[in-house]
């Protein structure tokens, strides 16, 4: 069976892993890093950049650079570039496609299957959007699993004995707090809570706002109106946040950040850990509510938690570690990389699906309650939050009016008592109900959640047997034709990228050959004939002309012709060099024979002529 790729599709960065020899191995990017920046950019010439290349040019191209798209998953948000609108699924697919290509290059084989992680608190729309992104990228998404659960898999693969663990997953854009019981290869999620709009990006925004305010106070210039300056400031804020996890102060230095009539302005500011912690305190305090909710839903107390696992870059910050220690009264685990464990766990789940990993059972839960709208705009729950998945639940409802021949099923997700306060997942109609007084028809509504946490809903009139099954069609979902179109677009992009790469390689090969030909002509002298020199010169000129056209096939043909000529010349030069070497060897042997004859006519045969005889006297030091 082909390898199953485990992917942590993150807000700021993404990671990937595969199973090798029963253990998860992190996949490096083509640039050599152990993570893929979740950044996509379009240059002014229309070229698409993904990952590190996109991040590097963000300062000079902020308006055409897309970051933190994960926060828009499951919404109707669109990015418009050059008149074309891209959904969050399409942008995410570009990131996934880059990961897929680099992983294939790393392991040397085609990858078609993946397990992708999502925040535990993602709703159905967001989960389906993530799965669609994988499909657009050319991946069969075998499973969508929760990030904290994946982290626990990576942490607990070799652990024995029963224990209750809490996973605190604070990433670039989301927070998840998950409590699970682990023992004898069974990972059972007891509860999960979180906030899909809380993460390291919010901390960065606080730092950016503070620095911009201080700069305005000092210079009167508001950097918030300058997109290029703000991108530089964002990079500096993130860097300062990371540095202050290990140092007490850092310097934020951005020369030529802006200019006014008096000339260029430079930003140079000292930022201390104490100031940083004061700035992000409001963000950190928002972490308490999900922690309390998770503990309450699991019907535990804080001191009943055996181990705490930290996941995500921001959990390296001392203020986060101290907050968790204070709340739970114990030190979090430090034995696993918080940036890599989610991807590793996803690859372990891939190993389970492929049959590589045995004796491991994952019992996850749905993070939010699911139900329908009933009379009076009431939210009636069919499946409570933290129900183990996969699961199926049915309930019988009836009509709200006399002679009602159809009913609308309004599917919702959330914890609020009124339907309009929750997230709408979709609406559909069951028609053809025989006219009858209200309350008489029997309509069975069935909710079915698969192992990915994705919902299917069915309504059936028990009197007539008529039923209507749906895949939720909320406005944020993509229909099959949209996905097929986006898959073709992604394949087209991949083909264009491959063509650009091939062109660059062909041009580089041609340049190298031209340099070699030029050097050969200069060094060859009279070792090659005038005809051979002329053929090399003509071949080089033909290749240069082909390069000017930009036609790959013409360049390849001219390169092949010149290569053939150069091979013939190289053969001649090699034979000349070989002949010269043989002549040198013969001359050296003749010289040695002549030297040996002179030694034979001397008075001391066998004596080294370089040794000089000397007299000596023994001296007694004791005299």
From Swiss-Prot:
Residues 582-623 are annotated as: Disordered. It comes from the Archaea. InterPro entries: ATPase_NBD, Chaperone_DnaK, Heat_shock_70_CS, HSP70_C_sf, HSP70_peptide-bd_sf, Hsp_70_fam. The keyword Chaperone applies. Signal peptide: none annotated. Keywords: ATP-binding, Chaperone, Nucleotide-binding. GO terms for molecular function: ATP binding; ATP-dependent protein folding chaperone; unfolded protein binding. Residues 582-603 have a biased composition (Low complexity). Residues 614-623 have a biased composition (Acidic residues). Acts as a chaperone. HAMAP family: DnaK. NCBIfam families: PRK00290.1, prok_dnaK. Belongs to the heat shock protein 70 family. This is Chaperone protein DnaK. It comes from Methanocella arvoryzae (strain DSM 22066 / NBRC 105507 / MRE50). The lineage of its organism: Archaea, Methanobacteriati, Methanobacteriota, Stenosarchaea group, Methanomicrobia.
